[in-house]
């Protein structure tokens, strides 16, 4: 990152670059971007409003609406050409709201009609904005059938289009709009095709929550305009938006250093170490997994096994309680140690908290780990100890500036991997409050503790104390089972031991962890019934495919 001030960085957002200012009718085919493996910037409503206002000043009237509707139509036409979803002259049914989202929908209907595709519009109330009125005139001139009530059944339509409300919705869907949202969502839930324009109606595009806890449309596909939005990838947004495609509409925004990104391999892959022939086990670091009080040995072993398969050179398990096994039969490569037998400060990285409990042994082990000048991952019970113990919390925060930390401390802040309840304890709020602003909560924790935060959940957020943040697009409900968090901790710990910077280690860990779940689910091992132990071998394969492809 550069050393510009926050004000200077944020000022980048108000200077959009415009494509050639030509009338909408002569625009080329719309550019549609798939977010897959792209570190796209994720824009808030406020940022997009600034972009849209400035961009519209340099364009002929109605151009952005014309481009948005054309992008939606182009997406439908391309999809239908590949999957036959409009075969047999099945028409498209379009729900248009009173604002600019409804105007986008009307333009889409006009473009479909001009392309010879039957389209019908349901417009429950009259449109209210100047741009939308223009779009209505164009649709009527093109002969688009427009009614004020929906048909008795939507089953005859090839696609349904949600153009009710976009990012400007500030209150829950009510009345006829709520009824339409239910009907449209029912179609998506029964394997029908639903396209949302910009965002599913009723979704808060900043947070991924439903607006004020109300209803929201469930879509199978979303074409989002100008730029991607964080709410499409977090909490309910992932279920409601379906497959997301970005239509920039010819406006390109220079990206500030601290803008939120969609996590992608280009953000972390360059930081992996080379695997030269002249390497040995010490080259790729020694990790100690610290945890496993009496009766809780499984969690650290899961983490340690994952660390082995994520490329760490040597992996130790430092148990803190009695009764630990002498070795791990499936993985005798792991080195298991009874309490107090391993010199933690001799390790290249530590992963602390798995199966640790909250007793005296756990507090002592965490305090010892915090005093070690090595990269440190903190998970599970260790996070709960920090939340309940002011001295431990202050010690963690002090590591960010303490002289006792490694010389490269800014490169290797601690990594904390809380789930929402653990994060809420650290912030002294409720989990519900935290979930209302996952990005803000993760950034607040990063600032409070001078640490990289991995806020787990649907759309895991990774936030750095230097202001960088990303939302992870991989993973699915298969990860909602015991032990998967331990596996994630082991993966990130292994990457810290291999000397990846903390932020990039966290990005890589959550991406690979989620990708492994996606891969297993696609192969039939999920989303129901996947076990944590299945993830690590798949992570190994994906890591080698992505970072270390075979030599010719």
Language-model regions: role of each:
Residues 4, 11-124, 217-221, 227-380, ...:
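Small-residue (G/A/S/T)-rich helix-start motifs and N-terminal tracts that mark the onset
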Residues 7, 11, 151-153, 159, ...:
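Generic detection of intrinsically disordered/low-complexity segments and helix-coil linkers/edges
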Residues 159, 164-258:
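Internal gly/pro-rich beta-alpha loop/helix module
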Residues 107-188, 325-343:
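N-terminal small/polar loop signature for handling phosphorylated ligands or for N-terminal nucleophile
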């Amino acid at each position: 990152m550069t050393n510009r001030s926050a004000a200077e960085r944020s000022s980048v957002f108000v200077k959009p670059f415009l494509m050639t200012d030509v009338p909408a009718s002569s625009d080329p085919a719309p550019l549609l971007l798939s977010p897959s493996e792209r570190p796209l910037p994720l824009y808030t409503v406020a940022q997009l409003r600034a972009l849209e206002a400035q961009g519209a000043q340099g364009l002929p009237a109605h151009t952005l609406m014309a481009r948005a509707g054309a992008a939606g139509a182009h997406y439908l036409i391309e999809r239908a050409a590949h999957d036959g979803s409009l075969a047999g002259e099945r028409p498209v049914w379009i729900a248009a709201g009173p604002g600019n989202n409804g105007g986008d929908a009307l333009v889409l209907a006009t473009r479909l009609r001009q392309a010879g595709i039957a389209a019908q519009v349901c417009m429950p109330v009259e449109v209210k904005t100047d741009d939308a009125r223009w779009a209505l005139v164009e649709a009527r001139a093109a002969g688009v059938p427009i009614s004020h009530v929906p048909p008795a059944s939507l089953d005859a339509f090839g696609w349904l289009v949600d153009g009710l409300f976009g990012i400007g919705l500030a209150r829950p869907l009510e009345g006829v709009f709520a009824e339409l949202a239910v009907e449209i969502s029912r179609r998506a839930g029964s394997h029908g095709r639903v396209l949302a324009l910009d965002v599913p109606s009723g979704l808060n595009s900043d947070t991924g929550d439903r607006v004020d806890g109300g209803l929201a449309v469930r879509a199978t596909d979303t074409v989002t305009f100008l730029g991607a939005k964080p709410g499409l990838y977090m909490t309910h947004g992932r279920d409601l938006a379906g497959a997301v495609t970005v239509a920039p509409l010819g406006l390109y925004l220079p990206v500030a250093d601290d803008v939120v990104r969609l996590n992608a391999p280009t953000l972390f892959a360059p930081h992996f170490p080379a695997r030269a022939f002249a390497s040995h086990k010490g080259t790729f670091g020694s990790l100690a997994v610290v945890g496993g009080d009496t009766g809780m040995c499984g969690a650290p072993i899961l983490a340690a096994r994952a660390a082995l398969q994520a490329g760490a050179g040597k992996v130790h398990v430092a148990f803190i309680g009695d009764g630990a096994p002498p070795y791990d039969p499936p993985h005798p490569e792991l080195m298991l140690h009874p309490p107090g037998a391993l010199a933690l400060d001799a390790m290249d990285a530590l992963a602390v908290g798995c199966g640790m409990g909250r007793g005296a042994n756990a507090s002592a082990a965490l305090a010892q780990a915090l005093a070690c000048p090595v990269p440190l991952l903190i998970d599970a019970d260790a996070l709960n100890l920090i939340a309940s113990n002011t001295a431990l919390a202050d010690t963690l925060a002090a590591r960010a500036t303490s002289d006792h930390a490694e010389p490269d401390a800014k490169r290797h802040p601690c990594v904390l991997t809380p789930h929402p309840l653990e994060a809420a304890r650290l912030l002294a709020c409720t989990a519900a409050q935290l979930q209302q602003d996952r990005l803000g909560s993760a950034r607040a924790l990063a600032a409070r503790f001078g640490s990289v935060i991995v806020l787990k959940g649907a759309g895991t957020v990774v936030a750095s104390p230097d202001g960088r943040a990303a939302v992870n697009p991989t993973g699915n409900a298969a990860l909602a089972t015991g032990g998967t968090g331990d596996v994630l901790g082991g993966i990130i710990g292994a990457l810290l031991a291999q000397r990846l910077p903390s932020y990039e280690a966290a990005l890589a860990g959550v991406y690979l962890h989620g990708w492994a779940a996606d891969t297993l689910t696609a192969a039939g091992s999920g989303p129901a019934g996947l076990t944590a132990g299945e993830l690590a071998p798949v992570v190994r394969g994906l890591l080698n495919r992505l970072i270390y492809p075979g030599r010719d």
